[in-house]
């Protein structure tokens, strides 16, 4: 197996310079305008541009993500959205606000501190911008566990706050695996609209399922496991589409595997799991910088390449990556599934949420909000 030192040596080779002509420029004729908050490397922007939108403002505090964003879109995002000078740069009028607000406070992979974590309170910055600018549509995304955090109270507070701002609020859980990528990545999606309620029914009917094998590189420098690690039981297909092809947790140590298994156990708090290329992949992590996920393909166990990780998130082949290898894994793990965002954006347009409304909808009466997904 190739060592960490060799991987780090390759990091400089993978550091891409900013391009003179960024590959993803805004459309000349846009159907709507949007602002991109907590923009990361631009997953939301790619999806909404594919749906016909034009970005008029972006904000991201992470320097590495800012560089990647600039390399692809030709503009440097504004910084900390909590600062008055950043919010002052937001255009007065725009049609849609999108925000994948920080998920670590609500994620199983994080410490699930919720609003106790300062990142968990950033959603209130979104509320302030909504109140000031009154966009026609607000599109929010977070981890599936937001639904269960603090016994559902966290999500209930968010939904009620959105309703009190005078928006029709609808939410559901969508899985990236239904939108043409081989990844079991479930996310809470919230759509807030002024004109009329949004319906998730058409999106819930999407079942464009694919398998991981169709997204893998056929040639390249792959990092394989040695035979000492490949004591594989019979594969097990899960309802999620995941196919486990390797021992889990302590079991792998009970069958005489090399003590160096510690290297394998760094897999995003899901130790010693190997996934078959005939299924889908679990959600790429947002915190494990080494990105060590292993797959069984053509009888061999190997690590997913960087290109494959970006591909199973729906990023185009010409997407520019910047930073060291670990940074690039972290950036893609923090992003969103591009085809899913594009599908949501197209459905928002199709349902007529973005044309100018004759008037704003009256505020929705606050109350106990059901935690059942809305259509």
Predicted regions and their residues:
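S-adenosyl-L-methionine-dependent DNA methyltransferase catalytic core
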Residues: 1-55, 161-165, 173, 183, ...
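Short, histidine-centered active-site or binding-site loop motifs used for metal coordination
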Residues: 110, 142-144, 288, 325
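Core alpha/beta nucleotide-donor-binding catalytic domains of modification enzymes
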Residues: 2-137, 144-156, 163
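Conserved S-adenosyl-L-methionine
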Residues: 78, 167-178
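Short beta-strands and strand-loop turn motifs
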Residues: 137-143, 172, 322
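Short glycine-biased active-site loop of nucleotidyltransferases that positions the nucleotide triphosphate
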Residues: 89-90, 180-183
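Short acidic/polar capping segments at secondary-structure boundaries
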Residues: 144-145, 176-179, 195-197
């Amino acid at each position: 197996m190739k060592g960490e030192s060799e991987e780090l040596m390759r990091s400089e080779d993978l550091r891409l310079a900013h391009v003179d002509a960024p590959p993803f420029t805004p459309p000349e004729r846009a159907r709507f305008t949007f602002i991109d908050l907590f923009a990361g490397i631009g997953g939301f922007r790619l999806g909404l541009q594919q749906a016909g939108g034009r970005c008029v403002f972006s904000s991201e505090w992470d320097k590495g993500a800012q560089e990647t964003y600039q390399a692809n879109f030709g503009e440097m995002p504004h910084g900390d959205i909590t600062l008055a000078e950043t919010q002052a740069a937001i255009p007065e009028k725009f049609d849609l606000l999108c925000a994948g607000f920080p998920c670590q406070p609500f994620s199983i992979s994080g410490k699930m501190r919720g609003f106790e974590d300062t990142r968990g309170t950033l959603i209130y910055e979104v509320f302030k911008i909504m109140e000031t600018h009154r966009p026609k549509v607000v599109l929010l995304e977070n981890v599936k566990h937001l639904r269960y955090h603090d016994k559902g109270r966290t999500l209930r507070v968010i939904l009620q706050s959105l309703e009190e701002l005078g928006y029709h609020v609808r939410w559901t859980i969508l899985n990236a695996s239904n939108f043409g990528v081989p990844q079991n990545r479930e996310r809470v999606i919230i759509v807030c609209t002024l004109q009329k309620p949004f319906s998730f029914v058409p999106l819930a009917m999407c079942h464009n399922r694919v398998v991981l094998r169709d997204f893998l590189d056929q040639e390249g420098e792959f990092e394989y496991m040695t035979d000492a690690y490949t004591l594989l039981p019979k594969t097990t297909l899960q309802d999620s589409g995941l196919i486990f092809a390797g021992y889990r947790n302590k079991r792998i140590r009970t069958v005489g595997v090399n003590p160096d298994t510690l290297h394998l156990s760094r897999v995003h708090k899901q130790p010693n799991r190997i996934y078959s290329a005939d299924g889908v992949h679990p959600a790429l992590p947002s915190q494990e910088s080494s990105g060590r996920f292993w797959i069984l393909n053509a009888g061999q166990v190997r690590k997913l390449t960087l290109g494959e990780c970006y591909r199973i998130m729906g990023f185009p082949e010409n997407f520019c990556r910047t930073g060291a290898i670990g940074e690039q894994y972290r950036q893609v793990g923090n992003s969103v599934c591009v085809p899913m965002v594009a599908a949501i954006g197209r459905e928002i347009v199709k349902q007529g949420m973005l044309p100018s409304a004759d008037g704003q909808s009256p505020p929705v009466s606050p109350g106990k909000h059901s935690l059942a997904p809305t259509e």
